[in-house]
């Protein structure tokens, strides 16, 4: 699928989603809450948490995970879930104060000395070869990034998905390059992606830990050296398509089935179906890490 095809398909899916959203707001809230644990587990896994999805669900249900787990990982799951739940139910506009409050929640019981504040004085941070912004300028740089995001989305045609996804991608890259906190930058940054989608009436996305070295880290590294955020825009477009496909399928189809079962019935090789799913040329989506699709979906055969 070409870049043009992605945006055309995304525009079509957003329009379909918005029509469903007016009639199924409660169902969409439940879908978002049902995938909360998966989003939490994946975001923490990007930061090397060892908690599985089952572990995370146990923690969020008030139980201890199986086996020997670090207490920090338990706090990480509970705290990120609290921030995500606030995002899904809240209406407060995106601001520096909101970011700091969410950061305080995220690091509560983990790094109370650093929770809810920007880096200070000699609190420099490094991720691999990337050095975060000078701590003396962090507050101003983040304020500038927020101002630019507001300007980008104000100028953008809200009906044109490319402009708003591009603005969110640029902000995320800039946020991660600044690295405003001593700890928790990645998790808060990914929360902010979904806050921005939420404010635009769009569903949350899940950045997958398994694909971080292929899909997520390279666009951040490229932006840090070239100011080019196109790779992040492309990634967020595909993740948003997947999220829309999931919601449209759950609201309009009687059953969803594993992609492997659909591929067998459609006489398509499994690896071909999986590749189509990754490129979102079919309306497949992941539930509990497994590719899934509406049972009644029939792929259109191009004319010969």
Model segments located where?
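FIC/Doc superfamily catalytic core
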Residues: 1-183, 187-304
